[in-house]
Amino acid sequence: AEFFGVSPEKIKAGFDKSRAVFGRQETFKIGDKSCTLVLIKNPVGASQALDMIKLAPYPFTLSVLLNANYADGIDTSWIWDANFESILDMDIPQAFAGGVRHSEIARRLRVTGYDEDKITEAESLEDIMALIEAQSTDHAYILATYTAMLQFREILASRHAVGKEMN
């Protein structure tokens, strides 16, 4: 930016005006919790999302929402190639598994060696919302496959936590 003569103030102003595209590091509140929704579609994307949240300098609750609809890809075996083991290096006091394949993603989290007593499976995305609201941390990251993200956003929009538009 310095090469082009753009001041730090102008860069900051640009970032302040920008909006995240839905599901792509979209931020919102659930109750008093600061939440970030990240779309995951394959092992590389999931691993990169995990690398990103690993940079958080605070404890957070992790929710992973896994669906297996046509738009997601029916085969979810890719979760075994994603680096979920990296959660062992993060300050995550609680993890929630949701979506149509909640038991599969819960199993994947258990296999990492993460304390299985800290993993809660949720039958519905509404249950995930309630779990996030009741969590002990101030922050939550929600990693979701495409249709799980759409369904979760629909619930968020009905609670006015996000807009209904899908930019």
Predicted ranges, named:
Residues 2-167:
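ATP-dependent carboxylate-amine ligase
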